Amino acid sequence: MKNIFLHSLIVENYRNFKNLELKTDNIPITIIGENGSGKTNILEAISLFYPGRGLRSARLADICRESEDHCSVRALLQSKLGLAEFSTQIKRISNRRTTEYNNSKIANNELSKFTSMVWLTPQMEGIFMSGTSDRRKFFDRIVYNFDPKHAELVSKYEHYMQERNKILAEDMWDNNWLKTIEEKMADTSIYIANNRLKTLEFMQQAIDDLENEFPKAELSIDGMVEQKILNGEEDVVGFIAAELHKTRDKDKLLGRTSFGVHKSDFLVKHKHKNILAKFCSTGEQKAILIAIILAEMNYAIKLTKTAPILLLDEVFVHLDDRRRNYLTEFFISINLQLWVTATDLKGIEEFGNKSQLIKL
């Protein structure tokens, strides 16, 4: 098995940190400190070396330290391709972020070729109650760990969609160019939908196989494209292109694309109770989310033979003793780099004793 882990992390002008350097190894790491000390900021900095906008989905302007116009994060990281240096630079004025791998610029969506990460934050605990977009993005991040090319496909699809919206906003359309863009969207959609369905199958199997103290979840994708593929219908690409053509006038008025895989929803049920997670208590929602994260991590290791970095922000808060004890024992037993934040070690003393301790 190949482990993804940080050897070192250096941040400059990042959030509340002027400068911070951490040396780590392939072991559990516990960050303790008062609220506001910057525990989550460290996890966020690490998460920038994975496709997307980090675990907070923050605006670039919010990441730089107040009064500073730039910030940076550097990491020496054991990647899928071996030991490598990664860096990301953010400039507040230009609102731009650049990422480098061994001093060569790479696109953000290429990071999944090198790294693998799973994270859980308190903000994610409301994902079952939030909008479709948040759940879909959450699930697409899971897909990245099973198929590193998925991030690039999603990025490509979003680019084509923006191009289509720009064309529709014009008074006169170039029908040939619009047709070409819609065909590219349709082709890319099939890959995205198939990746989601394959990952959904992997994840459901992982959840069913994993015996733990958390409720079983039943996963599904609510999307027209995914459903047509599941039904075994022919020429789904042609159907997507035809739908995009049909909705041109409507989408021109709306100023956005109203049909496509960017509208699909990720649905989660409490399997035993047979109710959607959004109708469960907040405690049950957190427990279901933890169950999904554990299953993702376990099956990603099983399927890809790669152990991801696991980032867990305040994961032990509001858990009963039974579940907290299960998690501490589970985390001690697994062989991967795990970052956990807590205000103190109360209730997780054993885990704290067996991890690298960082006090802020």
Curated annotation (Swiss-Prot):
PANTHER family: DNA REPLICATION AND REPAIR PROTEIN RECF (PTHR32182:SF0). ATP binds at residues 33-40. It comes from the Bacteria. Its main location: cytoplasm. This is DNA replication and repair protein RecF. Keywords: ATP-binding, Cytoplasm, DNA damage, DNA repair, DNA replication, DNA-binding, Nucleotide-binding, SOS response. GO terms for cellular component: cytoplasm. The keyword DNA repair applies. SUPFAM superfamilies: P-loop containing nucleoside triphosphate hydrolases (SSF52540). The RecF protein is involved in DNA metabolism; it is required for DNA replication and normal SOS inducibility. RecF binds preferentially to single-stranded, linear DNA. It also seems to bind ATP.
